[in-house]
């Protein structure tokens, strides 16, 4: 089992997602963010999950898709670094 570490940027993404959805419903904002976190938790047991991020073509930069969001992460020997939680409608530039 590997350790999953969230970057400050990824945590800020989660906060922004929560704030945006909360404008309509705090209940659904809590529920959706929990769903994203649970998806990331699966990486502890399955670190090679998801696919390579097409914009970067590097095997160690991968993504999971959850709803409209792309969870971008870096696979290292002993840990997974969650670097962004990015809406799929937005262009992914630098990470």
Regions found by a protein language model. Name each.
Residues 39-41, 61, 83:
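A short hydrophobic/aromatic micro-motif that marks alpha-helical segments and, especially, helix-coil
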Residues 1-2, 95:
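Absolute protein N-terminus
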Residues 3-57:
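Basic, Lys/Arg-enriched alpha-helical interface segments
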Residues 66-69, 74-95:
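Enriched for short, Lys/Arg-rich terminal
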């Amino acid at each position: 089992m590997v350790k999953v570490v969230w970057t400050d940027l990824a945590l800020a993404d989660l906060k922004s997602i929560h704030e945006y959805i909360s404008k309509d419903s705090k209940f659904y904002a809590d529920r959706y963010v929990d769903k994203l976190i649970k998806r990331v938790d699966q990486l502890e047991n399955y670190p090679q999950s998801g696919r390579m991020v097409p914009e970067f073509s590097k095997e160690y930069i991968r993504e999971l898709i959850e709803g409209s969001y792309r969870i971008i992460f870096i696979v290292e020997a002993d840990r997974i670094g969650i670097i962004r939680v990015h809406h799929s409608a937005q262009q992914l530039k630098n990470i």
